[in-house]
């Protein structure tokens, strides 16, 4: 039977680490034991975890879009481990279920119909990931009406700029956090000038 490894980005935020642990626990209730690995900031790495597994392994990328970490880092760790039997699942998003959760997070932050929505993602240099973020925005728009996209770390337009443009319409502006866990990026969203910021997924 295959062993499952949840692969996340990694964060120095204790709350973010707890978020990932809670996700791994939730997955384990569905599939059995789940180990956790990180591609950045924290350890163990996917290659380190894979080196301790004798049988087949399934890597579960805990990412909301398939950017550099998914297309480069994770396969590189698989190759580095030398493990002969590794399957890699798709990323968590975009997905209609996540869009529904995002809409709920927005309502909890005070958003009401008619307010402007900015979907904030970490960003990526990978065009595939950017396309997936726009797909996520389209899925969210089914719940909220038009959704603009902004990036926190990589890519344009930046979240603060998109919030400023949306505010020029005279409406309240809310940020939908397309982030998986608490951490530095979520903290930065509070500084973007919106009327409210939803909690991460």
Q: Model-found features: residue ranges?
A:
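Active-site-proximal alpha-helix that buttresses catalytic centers in soluble enzyme cores
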Residues: 1-201
